[in-house]
Amino acid sequence: MSQKSDLRNRIKFTLLLLVLARLGIFIPVPGIDHDAFYASVEKNTLVNFLNIFSGGGFSTIGIFALGIVPYINSSIVMQLLTKIIPDLEKLQKEEGELGRQKITQITRYLALGWATLQSGAISIWVKPYVFNWNFTFVCESVLALTAGSMIIMWLSELITEKGIGNGASLLIFQNIVSGLPKNFTQSFFDANYSNTSIKFGLFIVIFLLMIIITIFVQEGTRRIKIISARQLGKSSILDPNSYLPLKLNQGGVMPIVFASASMALPAYLTQLTQNTFLLQVLYLFCPNGSLYLVLYSVLILFFSYFYTSIVMNPEDIATNLKKMGASIPNIRPGQATIDYLQVILNRLTFLGATFLFTVALIPFIIEKVAQIQNLRGLGATSLLILVGVAIDTAKQIQTYVISKKYDSMTK
């Protein structure tokens, strides 16, 4: 099979699975008065926030309403556990592919449990709109929603293994894109705004500015010069092509995905309790809450550092440089190199996280200043994920093409 044909088939396979994942959202869970439910939650801020990840699934309560969120949440928990539990860290690092498969299997079980809990919360939440709410309905709805979430998880893994790009990221990408037309029309054409054309122009300018900033954050790189043993004594001028690239945002799109998915948790929990005090506390961390931005910024910073620690280990980099006979000019090999790289990574991660949160803050400022409502659905979280996933997928396609070229050259 030719290189172009193989790539084309992978892209077709990916698109087919994305279409299947999208269709499942429109298959309703039986027993619910969906028209009454939709009319009730259409302008609900919490539901609109959750719809970012489900592509509108929480407005229709389709069998794929949970989407990929349970799998993402279980991945967060699993990655935290691998840092805390030595046996899991050893399993991930030292046992190769077999160890990674075991980690993946544990993550699936966690996703199953998480999906079951969320399904139960939804079955209680929709009680006022159910024709005959009883134990049988709860069991049936939990089974349908959990099965739908497991199917989505399976589709995401198939995309990652046999398609192009990261399956979970592409599914979220698709869900966000599917909601853009509705949010766009609500923001400008269905609302009674004065000076609509001026606000529309302002929105376009700011939207493009946010894209530029996002690309800068995703692609910004600090190049650390390195010199090999072969260069020593030959020339006092360093080869400009010999450098160690450290990205401004090592985690790519994942910190914002993890932070946003975590921010959905308070919204879920509000459906599980009727306690007035607990509801007041939870609402503080919901999209319109006074502590929402504070928690959001802390989570972005935390996941940026956390994900950087996973993908970039200064000790491993220093060891690999030593094996290659390379070093950083004016920095001693060994612990000095590790300390130097750690300081650089910490600074880059903080700067990258600050940029991410700045972009996340822009839609809130626009809503207050320009009085443009519903902008958050078109805003920071969505934009960061859209641009990040688009860049990552394009790079994966490019890497795939290059690797196939090298394979054909070596045969």
From Swiss-Prot:
Q: Which GO terms describe its biological process?
A: intracellular protein transmembrane transport; protein targeting
Sorted keywords for this record are: Chloroplast, Membrane, Plastid, Protein transport, Thylakoid, Translocation, Transmembrane, Transmembrane helix, Transport
Family designation: Belongs to the SecY/SEC61-alpha family.
Q: Known HAMAP family for this protein?
A: SecY
- Location, primary (coarse class): plastid
- List localization entries: Plastid, Chloroplast thylakoid membrane
What transmembrane ranges does the database entry give?
Answer: 13-33, 52-72, 111-131, 135-155, 163-180, 197-217, 252-272, 291-311, 350-370, 377-397
Q: How does it assemble?
A: Component of the plastid Sec protein translocase complex, which is composed of at least SecY, SecE and SecG.
Q: Which domain of life is it from?
A: Eukaryota
Query: What name appears for this protein in its UniProt entry?
Result: Protein translocase subunit SecY
Which cellular components does GO assign to this protein?
chloroplast thylakoid membrane
Bilayer topology annotation: Multi-pass membrane protein
Role of this protein: The central subunit of the protein translocation channel SecYE. Consists of two halves formed by TMs 1-5 and 6-10. These two domains form a lateral gate at the front which open onto the bilayer between TMs 2 and 7, and are clamped together by SecE at the back. The channel is closed by both a pore ring composed of hydrophobic SecY resides and a short helix (helix 2A) on the extracellular side of the membrane which forms a plug.
